[in-house]
UniProtKB/Swiss-Prot annotation:
Phosphorylated by CK2 (casein kinase II), specifically by complexes containing catalytic subunit CSNK2A2. Keywords: Nucleus, Phosphoprotein. Residues 227-249 have a biased composition (Polar residues). It is found in: Nucleus. GO terms for cellular component: male germ cell nucleus. PANTHER family: CASEIN KINASE II SUBUNIT ALPHA PRIME-INTERACTING PROTEIN, CASEIN KINASE II SUBUNIT ALPHA'-INTERACTING PROTEIN. This is Casein kinase II subunit alpha'-interacting protein.
Length: 720
């Protein structure tokens, strides 16, 4: 006999078994436990992801006599794979499938004579090792009369722990009455030696042995040429099927112990030929982690009890009676890539769901669920990285801290130190910092430049002196804004910053105590309202606060001295009851205007300037002029001009306002008496311009005439 070698390829066979008396075929093994079953048992073609299941077929009663000879023939412990071979018939076709599976195939066949029928059984061996391990099987031919059956014995040696063997068979059976198929799939371990491979071979006396050997030799040559092409290696990886979880579990158990373990189920599909050729695909790519089964033959009855039968149908081509390409369920193909990704995780075994008919169906849905479950795991590091970036951003944004500049400035009264400290501590630095940053952002949104440090960039907080804390929403102690227990706390940042990144903050606590004399110091000129209204204006208007803070000294002692001097000025001004604030302001403006003129003019303006010096601390221009010229009050000795000026001012009380269209700055900038003469005629020239508003003309006439009379009388008195 010529040994047959077959590399990386499995194939299916087309056979026509209608001839009964002339066909001689070998058989290796079959069991007689299920021989009493009827031929009417339906055979359905089913395939799992990595396993093949076959329901036990029924055999004729007359075949029981050959059971003893078959059992004696199967004592060899060699590693064998089963394949299908064909008996020469009228149109026997051999067609290789497009999926490579094995690297070597060696078998020798022997035949016996049969009287009326032919019973075919094929034995093949395969090995994944580079060295071609050959195995020989002992094939015997039983004598049957009316049935033609195929009994296939599959044996696969388990190689290294990282290799996996998955096998399947593609067979075809035809008969007039009922074909049957019995496939036993076993895998021995590597410990079986090649010495066991040699078994006794039964030589047949058939005349067609030579033709069969020629057929195998031609097949061997064609297969070796086909396997040399690299396309099969690519298909080896593409046409892979996902292994079931039960097979993975079985492979782990089989690796630990090479001893036989009959408790693990073997999945063998039952295939029905329907008088046509059918195909069962083999997944060679999954052969790296195949299930090494025990080196023993299991009875077909036991296989039927412990095998799950997934429903996967293969297609056949009845016209050509040839094997089609392997067809599996589309879900199985789609999940092939999913199982490859999930192999290293070694998921727990998922038990297949039982059918109403008692069969089990292994579905690939758990693979899809596992993929979906693995998606959030990949997103977890992304979330943690995002949280880290969010945590680091605010730390980079806030690079400066606040530092209170002590002592706190208190205006409008006296407050104990403990109360002031409680008020300051009631407002956290973070809230102040947020409020200041908001104001900067609002100004940028409006298109305004960054505000300079001062009252324009400040935050105000209402404070209750009774609670000694800032008022967030409401306070029961306060009845309104004018309540003496209510105060306003101003927090103003200063431009100086330390090396530590801290910004000094000036804290000013303004008390709303209207009856205090110090409140009159903040009264602006040309204001007819009382001190209470002025305090409300200070609380609401930041521009007023800016003017006030220009005169705040750096230390508390200087501030107290400034308050004392201002109180003295107020006491001096309160003694002159005949002169009100309105003529004082006009007299003060006249003094500033004529300060660069003749000394006579300064002597006349001297007494009035001394009385109006209390208001010189309001604007920067007035304070500079009063400080720069302290000499005019010294030559005031003659009291004669005082009643004249008082007499004149008494007349001009009702006409103290400037004419419309002229500003205080323009009036102050005039330095000589020529400007006064020039201003006598402009009202006449301005009449046609202001004719559209009669009210303005009337007011302008009255105001200009009053001022002209005032200046004329004053100059006449000076000349005299």
């Amino acid at each position: 006999m010529v040994p047959l070698g077959y590399n990386n390829k499995y194939f299916g066979y087309v056979q026509d078994c209608q001839q009964q008396a002339t066909d001689n075929s070998p058989i290796h093994y079959y069991t007689g436990d299920k021989q009493n079953q009827s031929y009417s048992q339906s055979m359905c073609k089913e395939q799992s992801q990595n396993t093949v299941t076959v329901s036990p077929a029924s055999f004729n009663k007359k075949a029981q006599s050959t059971q003893g000879s078959y059992n004696r023939a199967m004592k060899s412990s060699s590693s064998l794979y089963s394949t299908c071979s064909t008996t020469p018939s009228k149109d026997s076709l051999l067609k290789n499938s497009s999926y490579p599976s094995w690297k070597s195939l060696d078998s020798s066949l022997s035949h016996h004579k049969s009287e009326t029928t032919s019973l075919t059984s094929f034995t093949s061996t395969s090995s994944l090792e580079p060295s071609k391990i050959s195995s020989r099987s002992r094939l015997l031919l039983p004598k049957t009369q009316t049935s033609s059956s195929i009994d296939l014995c599959w044996k696969s040696p388990s190689l290294e722990s990282n290799q996996r063997v998955s096998t399947s068979s593609s067979t075809s059976v035809q008969h007039h009455e009922a074909p049957s198929l019995n496939i036993i799939w076993t895998t021995p371990s590597l410990e079986s030696n090649q010495s066991e491979h040699d078994s006794q071979l039964c030589k047949s006396k058939s005349q067609k042995d030579s033709s069969l050997d020629r057929l195998w030799s031609s097949l061997l040559e064609s297969s070796q040429k086909a396997l040399s092409s690299p396309s099969f290696t690519n298909r080896l990886q593409r046409n892979s099927f996902p292994p079931t979880s039960s097979s993975l579990e079985f492979s782990r158990v089989a690796r630990n112990s090479p001893l036989p373990d009959c408790s693990k189920p073997l999945k063998i599909p039952v295939s029905n030929s329907n008088n046509n050729v059918f195909s069962l695909p083999l997944s060679p790519a999954k052969s790296r982690k195949s299930t090494p089964s025990p080196h023993s033959f299991l009875p077909s009855r036991r296989l039927s009890t412990c095998q799950p039968k997934p429903k996967i149908v293969a297609r056949c081509d009845p016209s050509t009676r040839a094997i089609n390409t392997a067809v599996c369920h589309p879900k199985v193909q789609n999940t092939a890539s999913l199982s490859d990704k999930q192999r290293p995780r070694q998921l727990p075994s998922i038990h297949p769901k039982p059918n109403p008919s008692g069969q089990r169906v292994s579905s690939p849905k758990p693979c899809i669920k596992n993929k979906i479950a693995s998606v959030p795991c990949s997103r977890l590091p992304n979330k943690s990285s995002v949280e880290r970036s969010v945590k680091t951003e605010p730390e980079n944004e806030i690079s400066w801290a606040l530092d209170y500049s002590h002592p706190c400035i208190i205006k409008g009264g006296s407050v104990p130190v403990d109360v002031v400290n409680k008020i300051i501590n009631s407002i956290s630095k973070s809230t102040i910092q947020k409020d200041l940053s908001r104001q900067i952002l609002f100004r940028r949104m409006r298109g305004k430049p960054n505000p300079r440090p001062g009252p324009r960039l400040s935050s105000t907080y209402s404070v209750c002196l009774e609670c000694a804390s800032a008022i967030k929403s409401q306070c029961n102690h306060l009845s309104g804004k004018r309540d003496p227990r209510c105060a306003t706390l101003f927090v103003i940042p200063t431009p100086e910053s330390s090396t530590d990144g801290k910004v000094d903050v000036k804290i000013i606590l303004i008390l709303s105590l209207p009856e205090k004399p110090s409140s009159t110091c903040f009264q602006l000129p040309m204001k007819d309202s009382k001190s209470e209204n002025n305090l409300e204006a200070l609380d609401d208007n930041l521009d007023v606060l800016e003017k006030i803070t220009q005169f705040f000294p750096a230390s508390e002692s200087d501030f107290i001295q400034g308050l004392k001097t201002k109180r003295k000025c107020l006491a001096v001004s309160s003694e002159s009851k005949d002169l009100s604030q309105e003529p004082q302001s006009i007299d003060w403006l006249l003094y500033v205007k004529n300060s660069n003129g003749i000394q006579l003019e300064t002597q006349v303006q001297g007494p009035s300037s001394s009385s109006s010096s209390s208001c010189s601390s309001v604007s920067s221009s007035s304070s500079a002029s009063s400080i720069g010229r302290p000499s005019p009050p010294t030559p005031w000795v003659d009291p004669t001009p005082v009643p004249v000026s008082g007499y004149v001012l008494a007349k001009v009380r009702s006409y103290h306002r400037l004419p419309p269209g002229t500003s205080w700055l323009e009036f102050i900038r005039g330095s000589s008496s020529d400007t006064i003469k020039l201003r006598q005629s402009p009202p006449v020239k301005a009449k046609p311009v202001r004719s559209h508003n009669s009210k303005c003309l009337k007011k302008g006439k009255r105001e200009t005439s009053a001022l002209l009379r005032y200046f004329q009388t004053k100059f006449q008195n000076e000349k005299s």
